[in-house]
Amino acid sequence: MAIIIGSDEAGKRLKEVIKSYLLDNKYDVVDVTEGQEVDFVDATLAVAKDVQSQEGNLGIVIDAFGTGSFMVATKIKGMIAAEVSDERSGYMTRGHNNSRMITMGSEIVGDTLAKNVVKGFVEGKYDGGRHQIRVDMLNKMC
């Protein structure tokens, strides 16, 4: 499993904080926007492409508010994403929604909160069962 990460200019500093946190915790991290100045649309598309390239990959995109990246991610066939700004949502979106990507806003969450959100997301496991009905419904929409 790799954690694919990317950001636009507004999210670059927080992306580096999250990337360092993940690397310190021995995760395989791929930064698809490293050294680039990209729009949140391009950052989200690049992360989603790599997430979908291998089962088990997860994605994190950071822009100013998280909303733009979320809107892009939800337009991609087969992608279930969540805009998160709290630890519980980061964890629960994996367990109940089988989300493979989260988006966050660098102007919404601080460093410590962002690390805690990411921790919940990457450590969360999909519960399946009754939640699979909803996941199937979401996947039929695209």
Curated annotation (Swiss-Prot):
Catalytic activity: aldehydo-D-galactose 6-phosphate = keto-D-tagatose 6-phosphate
Cysteine disulfide links: none
GO terms, biological process: D-allose catabolic process; galactose catabolic process; lactose catabolic process via tagatose-6-phosphate; pentose-phosphate shunt, non-oxidative branch
Isomerase among keywords: yes
Pathway per the UniProt entry: Carbohydrate metabolism; D-galactose 6-phosphate degradation; D-tagatose 6-phosphate from D-galactose 6-phosphate: step 1/1
GO molecular-function term, one example from the UniProt record: galactose-6-phosphate isomerase activity
Keyword Membrane part of the UniProt annotation: no
Keyword vocabulary terms for this entry: Isomerase, Lactose metabolism
Source species, domain of life: Bacteria
Enzyme Commission (EC) number: 5.3.1.26
Oligomeric form and interacting partners: Heteromultimeric protein consisting of LacA and LacB.
Protein family according to the UniProt entry: Belongs to the LacAB/RpiB family.
Name this polypeptide is given: Galactose-6-phosphate isomerase subunit LacA
Gene behind this protein: lacA
